């Protein structure tokens, strides 16, 4: 697993969500199940249940990581997003790649989840590409 980085927050649909990169690949944006539950207005328990019911559909290390399964050296990173009590009480703390998020939303099967999926893909996951593209352009210009 690549190192996880907390790169601040962004406002999405009026909700402040963390910008997390790493885990599946360097500089790859990822999302916690907790954040997904907030965006979709669903209890975290329901999101985790949906993941657990379909866990065979997710590829570990590509789509999903369970941060409670030893992927983190310590829980310090998670304290940016959860309190100690929540971390201790959680059976699973899922982290999903863009691909994993798309798979999960497919299981939700509601029109609202489809709308949110498209919006999140454009405004959260695609933002990484725009930022990286700007950095490359700046680098090329500076090299001239």
Feature locations, PLM:
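An anion-engaging/catalytic patch
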Residues: 1-139
């Amino acid at each position: 697993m690549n190192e996880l980085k907390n790169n601040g927050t962004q406002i999405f649909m009026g909700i402040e969500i963390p910008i997390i990169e790493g885990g599946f690949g360097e500089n790859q944006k990822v999302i916690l199940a907790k954040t997904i539950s907030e965006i979709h207005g669903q209890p975290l328990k329901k999101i985790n249940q949906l993941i657990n019911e379909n866990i065979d559909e997710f590829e570990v290390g590509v789509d999903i990581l369970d941060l409670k399964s030893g992927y983190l050296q310590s829980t310090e990173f998670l304290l940016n997003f959860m309190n100690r009590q929540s971390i201790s009480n959680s059976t699973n703390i899922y982290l999903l790649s863009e691909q994993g998020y798309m798979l999960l939303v497919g299981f939700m099967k509601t029109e609202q989840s489809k709308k949110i999926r498209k919006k999140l893909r454009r405004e959260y996951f695609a933002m990484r590409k725009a930022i990286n593209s700007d950095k490359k352009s700046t680098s090329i210009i500076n090299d001239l």
